[in-house]
Amino acid sequence: FNLAKQSLENTKDANKIAQIETQFQDQFLNPKVTQNFKQNITNAKRMALGQTAPNFLATNSKGETVSLDSFIGKFVVIDVWATWCGPCKYQSPKFDKVANTYKKSDDIVFIALSVDEKIDKWIIDIKDKKVNVLQLHVKNETEFSKLYNISSIPRFILIGKNGELINSSLPFPSTDEFEIELQKHLKP
């Protein structure tokens, strides 16, 4: 099971996911393991490249509801983070710096999406944040994490103008690979 799970975590290609499903589907004797494997396959297929990114609702700092679908027509770069996450705090200024290089582009939005359970800690944390990144708090962090197959943060996601997943697990902004991946699709 662990080999199958690791194989799924290492690919976002729909064809490879289908191969993994075929390779492992009859190898589990325990019904709970089989069910867990099937759920992992379903999650991997939902997050495969080219799939429509699952819509979610979030709240901005004014308490207004925003949906992912409201950004159709723009590239969306998402930083999934929380106030209690040390690595998230480390990556945040680097994410902000990259967002700043694209600030003149009307067809790109950078979103810092908090998955904090308590919105009040998020409100305190974002009060001094730069305006180049839209600060949002996801309405249901558990549902969002399941939808996007997120088991750890920070996580960086790139969504295309038509709402399709381009990369559901971008490299960290502290690496050159982050900007290289963005430059394949975006123009500053």
Residue ranges, per PLM feature:
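Oxidative protein folding and maturation machinery
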Residues: F1-V66
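Short, internal strand/loop/helix patches
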Residues: T59, I123-N162
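Active-site acidic short loop of glycosyltransferases
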Residues: I72-K74, S105, V131, I150
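Thiol-/selenol-based redox modules, centered on thioredoxin-like
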Residues: K161-P188
